[in-house]
């Protein structure tokens, strides 16, 4: 109870600082633009859009060598997957030809589609990276971990994919992959096994490549970072001597999901400790380019009452639901095959089956009013799922025909490969 009150006070205080830095006003049809960028900039750094500009000046004062990222990747970037493009756009560090993100870069990458003003990429020597990582082991390991680190961290592309997947999947699959690599049965893995875990979980993450008229370009082979990274130091220490227990890993997953949820809540609530329903609609539709978007916004204007809001707890419960979209989609197939519309009671039951939890009537009523395309008080669930997938994948999702069973089948296959390799290294030759 005391912890909840403390968090509410912290959010309220932070929200107060945000409100003082923002202009009042309501948008009839919200759009992604400079205001949204300014809001989240203030939320992250307390200085709004000036953060990017200030970082460039600070780098110049320190005499650090910088290189322009655009010169290195703008040419072939169209041939990269959506996720690689996003990584390259937001990464701000470079070492030995490889690009890296800071924790702040990662938070920005999941909140925005693009960088409005790309700063120069800072080129680091190995000693510089060691200095950047020096404070990780003493940082608080709660739901403000990435915010507390700010620019004091290094995230590789492999880890970026891994972190994205954590934000879109339930915990159960991670436990399966973790146990498959735990050859000793003590729910603990070493650093080299964690590298395999990242690849396994990221193997089928829904962030597919961009398709062109000619071919489908694949990401280049992901190289292992030649330096320590934030996650490696956090889990295994600077020298990699520690082991990672599943309970600690699960706490990290839960804290990361909570941190991003709180960041997005503050971004779209404009720093308040509640989110207006029209703000919630803006969050839902932020990464969506569906042809029915105008209808959704008409529903927001005509069906949602002024002054109604969504609490932080309600927002978190909805985000928890979105990590179970595959299970929810299976429940919805019953209605699709029967060509039946989905009514409120049926939707509520499907959510409970998929997640084991219930959404509040306030949330359900809001969702139904937004996604009722025909005015029949039923949910257009097919397009609703597409909107949610785009929202949770931050605009990086490409529609594909893959069931949840196929996803975990692939995870199991990759896990078995990791087990075989672990046995070979442990026993000299594998028993398979």
Curated annotation (Swiss-Prot):
InterPro entries, per database record: EF-hand-dom_pair, EF_hand_dom, MICU1/2/3
GO molecular function, one term: protein heterodimerization activity
Transit peptide segment: 1-22
Domain of life: Eukaryota
Any one GO cellular component localisation term in the record: mitochondrial intermembrane space
Annotated EF-hand domain residues: 169-204, 224-259, 290-325, 359-394
Binding site for Ca(2+) 2: 372, 374, 376, 378, 383
Modified residues annotated as Phosphoserine in this record: 202
UniProt xrefs under SUPFAM superfamilies: EF-hand
This protein's UniProt keywords: Calcium, Disulfide bond, Membrane, Metal-binding, Mitochondrion, Mitochondrion inner membrane, Phosphoprotein, Repeat, Transit peptide
Main localization, broad class: mitochondrion
Biological process according to GO: calcium import into the mitochondrion; cellular response to calcium ion; mitochondrial calcium ion homeostasis; mitochondrial calcium ion transmembrane transport; negative regulation of mitochondrial calcium ion concentration; positive regulation of mitochondrial calcium ion concentration
Function: Calcium sensor of the mitochondrial calcium uniporter (MCU) channel, which senses calcium level via its EF-hand domains. MICU1 and MICU2 form a disulfide-linked heterodimer that stimulates and inhibits MCU activity, depending on the concentration of calcium. At low calcium levels, MICU1 occludes the pore of the MCU channel, preventing mitochondrial calcium uptake.
Subunit and interaction comment: Heterodimer; disulfide-linked; heterodimerizes with MICU1. Component of the uniplex complex, composed of MCU, EMRE/SMDT1, MICU1 and MICU2 in a 4:4:1:1 stoichiometry.
PANTHER family hit by this protein: CALCIUM UPTAKE PROTEIN 2, MITOCHONDRIAL, EF HAND DOMAIN FAMILY A1,A2-RELATED
Protein name: Calcium uptake protein 2, mitochondrial
Gene name, Swiss-Prot/TrEMBL: Micu2
């Amino acid at each position: 109870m005391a912890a909840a009150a403390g968090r509410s006070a912290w959010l309220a205080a932070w929200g107060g600082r945000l409100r003082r830095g923002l202009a009042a006003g309501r948008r009839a049809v919200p759009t992604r633009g400079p205001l949204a960028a300014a809001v989240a900039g203030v939320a992250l750094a307390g200085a709004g859009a000036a953060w990017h500009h200030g970082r460039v000046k600070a780098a110049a004062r320190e005499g650090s060598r910088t290189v322009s990222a655009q010169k290195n990747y703008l040419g072939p970037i169209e041939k990269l997957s959506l996720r690689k493009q996003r990584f390259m756009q937001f990464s701000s560090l470079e070492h030995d030809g490889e690009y890296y993100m800071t924790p702040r870069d990662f938070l920005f990458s999941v909140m925005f589609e693009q960088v409005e003003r790309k700063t120069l990429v800072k080129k680091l020597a190995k000693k510089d990276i060691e200095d950047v990582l020096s404070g990780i082991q003493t940082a608080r390991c709660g739901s403000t971990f990435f915010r507390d680190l700010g620019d004091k961290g290094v995230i590789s592309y492999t880890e970026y994919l891994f972190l994205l997947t954590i934000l879109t999947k339930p915990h159960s699959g991670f436990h399966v992959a973790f146990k498959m690599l735990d050859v000793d049965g003590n729910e603990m893995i070493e650093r080299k096994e964690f590298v395999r875990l990242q690849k396994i979980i990221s193997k089928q993450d829904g962030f597919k490549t961009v398709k062109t008229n000619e071919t489908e370009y694949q990401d280049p082979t992901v190289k292992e970072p030649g330096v320590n990274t934030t996650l490696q130091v956090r889990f295994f220490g600077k020298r990699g001597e520690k082991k990672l227990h599943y309970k600690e890993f699960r706490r990290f997953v839960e804290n990361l999901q909570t941190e991003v949820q709180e960041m997005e809540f503050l971004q779209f609530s404009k720093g308040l400790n509640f989110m207006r329903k029209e703000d919630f609609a803006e969050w839902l539709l932020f990464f969506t380019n569906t042809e029915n978007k105008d209808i959704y916004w008409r529903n927001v204007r005509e069906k949602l009452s002024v002054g109604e809001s969504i609490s932080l707890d309600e927002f978190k419960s909805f985000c928890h639901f979105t990590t179970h979209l595959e299970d929810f989609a299976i429940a919805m197939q019953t209605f699709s095959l029967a060509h039946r519309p989905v009514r409120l009671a049926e939707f509520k039951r499907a959510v409970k089956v998929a997640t084991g939890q219930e959404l509040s009537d306030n949330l359900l009523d809001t969702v139904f009013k937004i996604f009722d395309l025909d005015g029949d008080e039923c949910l257009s669930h097919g397009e609703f799922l597409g909107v949610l997938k785009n929202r949770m994948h931050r605009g990086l999702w490409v529609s594909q025909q893959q069931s949840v069973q196929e996803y975990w089948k692939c995870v199991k296959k990759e896990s078995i490969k990791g087990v075989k390799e672990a046995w070979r290294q442990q026993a000299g030759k594998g028993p398979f």
